[in-house]
Amino acid sequence: MKALHFGAGNIGRGFIGKLLADAGIQLTFADVNQVVLDALNARHSYQVHVVGETEQVDTVSGVDAVSSIGDDVVDLIAQVDLVTTAVGPVVLERIAPAIAKGLVKRKEQGNESPLNIIACENMVRGTTQLKGHVMNALPEDAKAWVEEHVGFVDSAVDRIVPPSASATNDPLEVTVETFSEWIVDKTQFKGTLPNIPGMELTDNLMAFVERKLFTLNTGHAITAYLGKLAGHQTIRDAILDEKIRAVVKGAMEESGAVLIKRYGFDADKHAAYIQKILGRFENPYLKDDVERVGRQPLRKLSAGDRLIKPLLGTLEYGLPHKNLIEGIAAAMHFRSEDDPQAQELAALIADKGPQAALAQISGLDANNEVVSEAVTAYKAMQ
């Protein structure tokens, strides 16, 4: 089996690329970073530090790389069995034209073996969005052929991969946590379902997408925002602060009550999942900076994201949300010189006041009681 993976960054190399290569799949990375491309093509291998209770070093081998903006990537799409991405939500639109060209070439070459495309991004139904961009870039006479022969498979991914702090200055070395979860929608595949260790198949993807969003992402963000306010540097330092831990755990329990109502998750198993995530935040090997985790607060405070979406769920089912409100208030305080969204957030609050600003960012009605609750909590933090 041959695969092409867009994005040779830390997540691409440390998570999806590693799973594919470990499964014995012939893997080519596509990226724009020439230093990384040259290193991959010179060595055909790289090291991954897997850290949890213990630390181990795995070697990923048998890989190569191409530029994601050249002809090679188009040729590969015409040949491979699987295309995956870990490029970030914003970049999906940029890689779509190359994918479209490759699919046209595949059709012209008469290659009718099934191709499946899986976007492995920190977003809901990212592959469906990528499919929209690809379809827009395709000529009309190729669209029906693509619908018939190409599967666009949505997935949920979860693995903490902090920015590399390689002591060796090796551009390929990467550190990842032991935990990883890659759940894919088995109803969207074309052809035979793949058997890749570490890839879980489900016919109820949204339950797992929201479980991750409402637990890991919600908890991670609130830990970062409260941690930054309290002067902590890392996620570990923040979650070891008992006051912060109580709010984070409380928020995950509040969002968890929504998941249990909505999808019928087992309450005891979900409580264990929350404990596992708190343990991941404590990982001493992951030097995960609160500023990195907190960045892009406007996106994280938007209606479909990790803070407001679970809050809306608590309103839908008439459930408590005190800790989620604390997290939202802390997010409104997030300031970072390196993050344009943090600066935009500050300007919006200064211009409109916290109530109107939060309403605009979140899509909530300014007169909604929860907006007032968040503003009260926000002011109490000043």
From Swiss-Prot:
Residues that coordinate or bind NAD(+): 3-14
Q: Which Gene3D superfamilies match?
A: N-(1-d-carboxylethyl)-l-norvaline Dehydrogenase, domain 2, NAD(P)-binding Rossmann-like Domain
Q: Name one Pfam family in it.
A: Mannitol_dh
N6-acetyllysine sites (modified residues): 269
Q: Give the GO biological process terms.
A: mannitol catabolic process
Q: Which InterPro entries match?
A: 6-PGluconate_DH-like_C_sf (IPR008927), 6PGD_dom2 (IPR013328), Mannitol_1_phos_5_DH (IPR023028), Mannitol_DH (IPR000669), Mannitol_DH_C (IPR013118), Mannitol_DH_CS (IPR023027), Mannitol_DH_N (IPR013131), NAD(P)-bd_dom_sf (IPR036291)
Q: Is Aminoacyl-tRNA synthetase there in the keyword field? A: no
- Give Gene Ontology CC terms: cytosol
Listed under catalytic activity are:
D-mannitol 1-phosphate + NAD(+) = beta-D-fructose 6-phosphate + NADH + H(+)
EC number(s) from the headed UniProt entry: 1.1.1.17
Output the Gene Ontology terms for molecular function.
mannitol-1-phosphate 5-dehydrogenase activity
Q: Record's superkingdom?
A: Bacteria
- Keyword set includes Oxidoreductase: yes
Keywords (A to Z) from UniProt: Acetylation, NAD, Oxidoreductase
Similarity comment text for this entry: Belongs to the mannitol dehydrogenase family.
NCBIfam families according to UniProt: PRK02318.1-2 (NF002646), PRK02318.1-3 (NF002647), PRK02318.1-4 (NF002648), PRK02318.2-2 (NF002650), PRK02318.2-5 (NF002652)
Q: What is this protein called?
A: Mannitol-1-phosphate 5-dehydrogenase
In which organism is this protein found? Escherichia coli O127:H6 (strain E2348/69 / EPEC)
Designated gene of the protein = mtlD
